[in-house]
Amino acid sequence: DQEKLSRLNAITHPNVKKEIFRRIQRIKEKGEASFIAVEAALLLEEGYQNDFDTMWYVYVDEATRIERLKEGRGYTEKKCHEIMAKQLPEEVFRKECSTVIDNHLGISETENQIKTAVESLLSLY
């Protein structure tokens, strides 16, 4: 039910955002990290791109996403399609995110892409 989901998001996501920024502030104050990565649902939908230095998009084709959701979470194919229908289209992520990680080539290749992207990010600071 879209109305219930919208109400749930309106309740939870402002609190999630507050907690994310509370934790970021604590890490900054303690000088614990060279950079901070945040992974959360609805980052673009909630306007986080205005708060972070960079946004990354981890991409995998639809068939692989469905396969992983079915295997990892036990979802039906119908449930997978319902979830994906509520998400922003891939084009939006590709437009708004400065880095795209292709996650269909296996863990090793994904790790290499992330390592390269992190090194590139760190070279800027």
Write out the residue ranges for each language-model feature.
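ATP-dependent NMP and nucleoside kinases share a basic, alpha-helical "lid"
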Residues: 21-72
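Short alpha-helical
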Residues: 3, 15, 43, 63-64, ...
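A general structural signal for well-ordered alpha-helical segments in protein cores
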Residues: 5, 17, 37, 62-66, ...
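Amphipathic alpha-helical segments within well-ordered protein domains
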Residues: 9, 66-70, 81
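Residue-level signature of catalytic and energy-coupling elements of molecular machines
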Residues: 8, 37, 101
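Small-molecule kinase domains that catalyze NTP-dependent phosphoryl transfer to phosphate-bearing small molecules
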Residues: 19-20, 49-51, 71, 75-122
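ATP-dependent small-molecule kinase phosphotransfer cores
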Residues: 1-34
